[in-house]
Amino acid sequence: MLIVYFSSATDNTHRFVQKLDLPNVRIPLTRVEEPLKINEPYVLITPTYGGGVSMTGENSRPVPPQVIRFLNDEHNRSFIRAVVAGGNSNFGSDFGLAGEIISKKCKVPYVYRFELMGNEEDVSILRGGLTQNAQALGLEPQEPVTSR
């Protein structure tokens, strides 16, 4: 089971993913880095950007541009099996909005959302849910690995 994730320079999503103790690979932060190519089914974990704009009426771009670029590659998109989103519950209905958008566009389940860098309960729920439902999601079941 592979986790593909994006994390901004704050590393909140990175910290959460490392606590999952599952194989993972990070979508590059900058265009200078080599683009990521995925060749197996994966769960995408992404933060949500621009939280709270629905309350102000501004235009929202909740999916990070790096994630959009990654998913615009049809090959990468063909292997996505589920999406998880991070965010901030202070932003009301925008909390985890990136997950909703990706789920609809890629026609995959939006399986979980967590706040900021998640807590131990989030880690336990998501890890357990992914492990128990790996086959149903089209993922290869796998035992946790030691974090890198």
From Swiss-Prot:
GO terms for molecular function: FMN binding. It comes from the Bacteria. GO terms for biological process: protein modification process. Belongs to the NrdI family. Probably involved in ribonucleotide reductase function. This is Protein NrdI. It comes from Corynebacterium glutamicum (strain ATCC 13032 / DSM 20300 / JCM 1318 / BCRC 11384 / CCUG 27702 / LMG 3730 / NBRC 12168 / NCIMB 10025 / NRRL B-2784 / 534). The gene is nrdI.
